[in-house]
Amino acid sequence: MAPPTCRLLSAALVLLLLLATNHQATGAVVASELRCQCLKTLPRVDFKNIQSLSVTPPGPHCAQTEVIATLKGGQKVCLDPEAPLVQKIIQKILNKGKAN
């Protein structure tokens, strides 16, 4: 092979590898977003320790409703959305939001 052809082939191969790597990385992000975040749930947590609460309805990413509480220490815990205490916590937060 002539040197210009070899350089062109090398450049094309490098470009192809970069595109393949970029495509794989992008696919990995999508795949990780399309699954449930809560593998284990807690039936209760002290209301005073909750900094914020996120409720994610069922969708293509996960068949269950997910309730994720961020505690004042920064730790995130998954709560059981069917637990009576968790439902009371959600109602308290909703009522607190309506009062403001």
From Swiss-Prot:
Signal peptide: 1-27
Cross-referenced PROSITE patterns: SMALL_CYTOKINES_CXC
One MF term in the entry's GO annotations: chemokine activity
A biological-process GO annotation: response to gamma radiation
SMART domains (alphabetical): SCY
One Pfam family, short name: IL8
InterPro entries recorded: Chemokine_b/g/d, Chemokine_CXC, Chemokine_CXC_CS, Chemokine_IL8-like_dom, CXC_Chemokine_domain, Interleukin_8-like_sf
SUPFAM superfamilies reported for this sequence: Interleukin 8-like chemokines
Gene3D superfamilies named in the record: 2.40.50.40
Domain of life where this protein originates: Eukaryota
Disulphide bridges: 36-62, 38-78
UniProt subcellular location: Secreted
Keywords: Chemotaxis, Cytokine, Disulfide bond, Inflammatory response, Secreted, Signal
Recorded GO CC terms: extracellular space
Described function: Chemotactic for human polymorphonuclear leukocytes but does not induce chemokinesis or an oxidative burst.
Self-association and partners: Homotetramer.
Family stated for the protein in its record: Belongs to the intercrine alpha (chemokine CxC) family.
Protein name: C-X-C motif chemokine 2
Source organism of this protein record: Mus musculus
Gene: Cxcl2
